[in-house]
């Protein structure tokens, strides 16, 4: 017969194993983590001494979602108003804010050469202004050259399959039956 020994655990000298039921677990933890108990004092005084050692700081209020929503309503956007219109780094042009790398930026306009296409769109002619006034919109010129044929538009609901007429013939056979 072999006698098995319980497994030995390496423990520190300050480690104490305690078995407690849930009803008095809190009291035992407070006793063990508080000041060393006096032999003459009762368990109630040890618990109250542990409570007295805790710092009396105000408890932080719990985070509430509705408070975050209310604080987001109070946010404000502050736009820098530049008073000098001749400022080369001003990002304001004709009363609206443009991108710092936009061709509408006055600084960018002096540094970057304009292409013919940009100049064409910058100043619409009288015909274009008339078309805009009549129709309410205008079309930009096509980037394609005029020598190329117009692209073929495909029907939205084709009656025949693009790979042949087999599909159409198959439908006709079903109608005859």
UniProtKB/Swiss-Prot annotation:
Phosphorylated on serine residues by MPK6. It is found in: Nucleus. This is VQ motif-containing protein 11. Residues 115-133, 168-177 have a biased composition (Basic and acidic residues). Keywords: Nucleus, Phosphoprotein. Its main location: nucleus. InterPro entries: VQ, VQ_4/11/13/19/31/33. One of its GO terms (cellular component) is nucleus. The keyword Phosphoprotein applies. Residues 115-177 are annotated as: Disordered. The modification Phosphoserine is found at residues 43, 99, 115, 142, 145, 161. Residues 148-159 have a biased composition (Low complexity). A motif (VQ) lies at residues 25-34. It comes from Arabidopsis thaliana. May modulate WRKY transcription factor activities.
């Amino acid at each position: 017969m072999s006698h098995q020994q319980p497994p030995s655990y390496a423990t520190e000298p300050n480690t104490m194993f305690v078995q407690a039921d849930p009803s008095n677990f809190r009291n035992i933890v407070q006793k063990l983590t508080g000041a060393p108990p006096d032999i003459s004092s009762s368990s109630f005084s040890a618990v109250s001494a542990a409570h007295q050692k805790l710092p009396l700081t105000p408890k932080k209020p719990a985070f509430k979602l509705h408070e975050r929503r209310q604080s987001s309503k109070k946010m404000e956007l502050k736009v820098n108003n530049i008073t000098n219109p001749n400022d080369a780094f001003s990002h304001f042009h004709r009363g609206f804010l443009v991108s710092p790398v936009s061709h509408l930026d006055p600084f960018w306009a002096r540094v970057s050469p304009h292409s013919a296409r940009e100049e064409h769109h910058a100043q619409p002619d009288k015909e274009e202004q008339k078309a805009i006034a009549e129709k309410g919109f205008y079309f930009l010129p096509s980037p394609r050259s005029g020598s190329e044929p117009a692209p073929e538009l495909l029907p939205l609901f084709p009656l025949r399959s693009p790979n042949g007429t087999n599909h159409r013939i198959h439908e006709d056979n079903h109608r005859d039956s």
